[in-house]
Amino acid sequence: MQLEPAHLVYAAFWTFGLVNNVLYVVILTAAVDLVGPQTPKAVVLLADVLPSFLIKLAAPFFIHKIPYNRRITLLVGLSTVGMMSVSLASPLFLKLVGVVLASFSSGLGEVTFLQLTHFYDTRALNGWSSGTGGAGLVGSGLFMLLTTVLGVSVKTSLLVFAFFPLAFLGVYFYLLPPRDYNRVPGAFPVHSNDPETGIETQPITWEFVASGYETTMVRLKPLVMPYMLPLFLVYFSEYTINQGVAPTLLFPMEELPFSKFRDVYVTYGTLYQLGVFISRSSAPFVRIRRIMIPSVLQFANLVFCIAQSMSPILPNVWLVFILIFYEGLLGGAAYVNTFLLITEQADLAEREFALGSVGMSDSAGIVLAGLVSLWLEPGLCNYQVNDGRGWCTLE
């Protein structure tokens, strides 16, 4: 039985989203294992997101000059080598180098695949969004299954994920249907001397980048308020919760369904990703057009979680589990609805540029969250220790 091209498009972009984000999720889920309870988990967050943010920040100025097939090959190399380093290296520095390589791959992948959706109908974007949500569930869930349930070592568990990026090659070159290059007039002129992209090939020089700076900034300006600001706020809020507050949302061991405190953190990550997966997959059924609403609700969630850490309001971990799941629902809903609105509202000539550029705002929010969490997590932990609740210092 042969699948229809529309189904192949959805399956291909679902796989792209899954594989591109799964390593990012696993690294954050394993943060407590990589750096231990005494080091702020935001160290891993910054190494995991800052390179990705820099790629997204620079991409609008040059990324259209690199053919898609070369980008895919680069993604596989960076992510595979990165995860090998994370899983096999002993010094923390080398582990963080591996995290940085995987982060570069993740950022390049997000820009690449979001731009690639421009050549297909909305099934591509729906598949990508659902796949990125699935990455969270697969990454955190499989890591929790291997380490917490089955007792597999962290090293071996991380090594398993090093082989995931190979799927990019098979899906892009053999599963994804050919795309339509009948493009509308846009900022990137259509020429025929590059058969893979239809874009004129020329060297990427400093003069080329500088000459396009002002034009690019003008094109970014109308994207800020309706799309980039809400996405920035929701990501800042949820990643501050995940890396700066969640490690301190603990209860006495006898009240927990675990034997180690690190299992609480891993479970929080899995529940968050479950919420993200559900909401990112909900776009065909539920649409949110006022995307500032989930962003503001997420910020309120952050304030509540900080209050919970300082003076417990919720009496047990089960209610905190629900709170973290709700956090994931808000974040996933904001993400998928933002990019769907772009496909509906942006001019066709600007759509590919907008899809590839708005993603820098979520990374900016995560970077700021990491910087805040470097101070926030130790501050909350010290407050709890002085209050007689020193569980955040234990494994």
Curated annotation (Swiss-Prot):
Any one GO molecular function term: transmembrane transporter activity
Transmembrane segments: 43-63, 74-94, 96-116, 134-154, 158-178, 222-242, 261-278, 291-311, 313-333, 355-375
Keyword set includes Membrane: yes
GO biological process, one term: regulation of intracellular pH
Keywords in alphabetical order: Amino-acid transport, Membrane, Signal, Transmembrane, Transmembrane helix, Transport, Vacuole
Signal peptide boundaries: 1-31
Source organism superkingdom: Eukaryota
Compartment(s) where it occurs, according to its Swiss-Prot or TrEMBL record: Vacuole membrane
PROSITE patterns linked to this entry: MFS (PS50850)
Membrane topology term: Multi-pass membrane protein
Keyword Cytoplasm applies: no
Gene Ontology cellular component terms for the protein in this record: fungal-type vacuole; vacuolar membrane; vacuole
Disulfide bonds: none
Functional description taken from the UniProt entry: Involved in vacuolar transport and vacuole pH homeostasis. Also required for cytokinesis.
Family, per entry: Belongs to the battenin family.
Protein name: Protein BTN1
